[in-house]
């Protein structure tokens, strides 16, 4: 995964969750790349944010985030079922901006 792709995935997650919670992330096309987003978070060292996203995935029916948007929308719980995870995300247990900057500054990226 390129550094640019890592940046894009993390920013999309952050934008969607900050705008409407994990429900919005999964409902919209950003959720198409859920597995890749978890990987991107881990690559920049945002393990706590990756854990929050994985726990959000576990709350979808069957604990899986289908890659296809409309299939994913059918397995979404009510927004309130994800609210506690939204609040954990909003507390920013990992400083995504700093971690992204550090990741981009690495010579191999």
Predicted stretch roles:
Residues 1-34, 40-109:
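Extended, alpha-helix-rich binding/interface surfaces that flank or overlap catalytic cores
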């Amino acid at each position: 995964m390129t550094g640019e792709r890592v940046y894009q995935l993390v920013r999309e997650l952050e934008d969607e969750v900050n705008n409407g919670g994990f429900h919005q992330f999964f409902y919209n096309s950003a959720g198409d790349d859920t597995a890749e987003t978890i990987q991107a978070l881990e690559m920049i060292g945002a393990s706590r944010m990756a854990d929050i996203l994985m726990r959000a995935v576990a709350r979808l029916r069957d604990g899986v985030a289908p890659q296809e948007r409309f299939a994913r929308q059918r397995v979404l719980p009510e927004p309130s079922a994800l609210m506690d995870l939204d609040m954990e995300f909003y507390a920013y247990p990992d400083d995504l901006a700093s971690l992204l900057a550090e990741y981009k500054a690495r010579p191999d990226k």
